[in-house]
Design a protein with these regions (language model features):
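Conserved glycine-rich cofactor-binding loop
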Residues: 14-15
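Conserved glycine-rich Rossmann-like NAD(P)H-binding loop of the short-chain dehydrogenase/reductase
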Residues: 28-44
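Conserved Rossmann-fold cofactor-binding substructure of NAD(P)-dependent oxidoreductases
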Residues: 59-76
Length: 139
């Protein structure tokens, strides 16, 4: 008897580590729901396990709410086994210096906190029931 297919939700999936994470879980036959500000490359979407991509700006609370609603509609009654918060931002100054407490604008810091802290918090809360059903984990 085979195990039911597990489902992963991954943010920041359009390139780099996110794209590699999709490949890793796809090779293990997980169904994958992704989110990024940009559409992923077309060759990625040919993967049969990459089942649903939602374009969303996770800095914006309304966009997150819309994303959660659409993803939950796609999930239906199925459980969620993993939420990987890969989307993030670490801006640099014009001289390639990382944002620090003595440099950078407060608006940049607000954006960093919205994306790197509040978005994962909102997503964990938004998918809590689906994650509980799947005994899922949040990364």
């Amino acid at each position: 008897m085979s195990q039911p297919q597990k489902t992963l939700l991954l943010t920041g999936a359009s390139r780099g580590i996110g794209h590699a994470t999709v490949s890793f879980f796809s090779e293990r036959n997980w169904q994958i729901i992704t989110c990024s500000r940009e559409s992923p490359p077309k060759e990625c979407l040919r993967d049969p396990n990459w089942s649903h991509h939602i374009t969303a700006d996770l800095v914006n609370a309304e966009s997150i709410d819309t994303f959660v609603k659409e993803a939950k509609e796609f999930l239906g009654e199925r459980p969620l086994h993993g939420l990987v918060n890969n989307a993030g931002w670490s801006p640099k100054s014009p001289i390639e210096e990382r944002l620090g407490c003595l440099n950078g604008s407060l608006d940049a810091w607000r954006t960093v906190f919205e994306l790197n802290f509040f978005a994962p918090l909102r997503l964990a809360r938004g998918f809590a029931s689906s994650l509980t059903k799947g005994k899922g984990s949040v990364v």
